[in-house]
Amino acid sequence: MIIKPRVRGFICVTAHPAGCEANVKKQIDYVTTEGPIANGPKRVLVIGASTGYGLAARITAAFGCGADTLGVFFERPGEEGKPGTSGWYNSAAFHKFAAQKGLYAKSINGDAFSDEIKQLTIDAIKQDLGQVDQVIYSLASPRRTHPKTGEVFNSTLKPIGNAVNLRGLDTDKEVIKESVLQPATQSEIDSTVAVMGGEDWQMWIDALLDAGVLAEGAQTTAFTYLGEKITHDIYWNGSIGAAKKDLDQKVLAIRESLAAHGGGDARVSVLKAVVTQASSAIPMMPLYLSLLFKVMKEKGTHEGCIEQVYSLYKDSLCGDSPHMDQEGRLRADYKELDPEVQNQVQQLWDQVTNDNIYLLTDFVGYKSEFLNLFGFGIDGVDYDADVNPDVKIPNLIQG
């Protein structure tokens, strides 16, 4: 079939297998060009491995550190007449390139919040790797079924305490949109923490430790975003921020148990704002990202997922002098938070109108990166060619 982008709101409901493969190859080429990372992990579990930062971590571990990787994700395969998800095609491409390099790659498709998928993962580690020495936690999900109670929690993107006047960019109509977001109820806050907080990360590490599949001295990190004051009302001080603060709490107990396990470590890693399927769903992020791209590109400091994660590995996860803040988080977002960058973004934020969107922002760059997520708009891909949407992932365990 011939596959074209079909965008509905903040999601593209189609994905292109050849485009996704080219996108993965581009990230691999970046890591290969930057060169090997010293003292890197050799057996890595990536929870949330198919898109965005999780995929970038899997690529960096494999092609930067020479690691064998086991990836967990929840994606839909293509079938005749219907494309699969971009994460499915990304993972198929990753497997293909890892095999060419002689690297072990296995993946598990299913709900990472469930006990069943945790057990399948443990079994795969025991059978193939023995143990893992690094665990990356990069799940982005709008809902979670609690594995012990069966209760279904949904995350909510709302401020806490007071209503917030929100400025955003309607990406369909290409207009600036002002809206009012009502505050979250306590129940909505609790549910968001249940989905996006640190409980599942802790459950994963506890399960892996109990099963004896974490090597002594193993490290784990969960990815997060903090942002600056422009995004704080809706993000850090909102319902999602409550979940992110829960990560900061849960990491303390995880760090303690890993430290007792041969001197291991657990850290929250703070990464910059990028275009992902998760971030495009946040009302103000398309406008913020379009402005941020413009300012950072002009400064020559613009980075995407792979650049961020490669530097996180090289400088902090595997380096001798990690970028660490007072709370003990690893920081890779310092170029975004440069006061000069934030001041310029704030000034443009107040000036942007329907008439000057393309002048004051890099909305063109935002749209391009958004389509790239789904394998569209990639140089060298023939989008008029007939492609088979049914792409198999070798070494896949279906949960």
Swiss-Prot record:
GO terms for molecular function: enoyl-[acyl-carrier-protein] reductase (NADH) activity; NAD binding; trans-2-enoyl-CoA reductase (NADH) activity. NAD(+) binds at residues 48-53, 74-75, 111-112, 139-140, 244, 274-276. InterPro entries: Eno_Rdtase_FAD-bd_dom, Enoyl-CoA_Rdtase_cat_dom, FabV-like_NADH_b, Trans-2-enoyl-CoA_reductase. One of its GO terms (biological process) is fatty acid biosynthetic process. The keyword Lipid biosynthesis applies. Gene3D superfamilies: NAD(P)-binding Rossmann-like Domain (3.40.50.720). Pathway: Lipid metabolism; fatty acid biosynthesis. Monomer. HAMAP family: FabV_reductase (MF_01838). Belongs to the TER reductase family. This is Enoyl-[acyl-carrier-protein] reductase [NADH]. It comes from Yersinia pseudotuberculosis serotype O:1b (strain IP 31758).
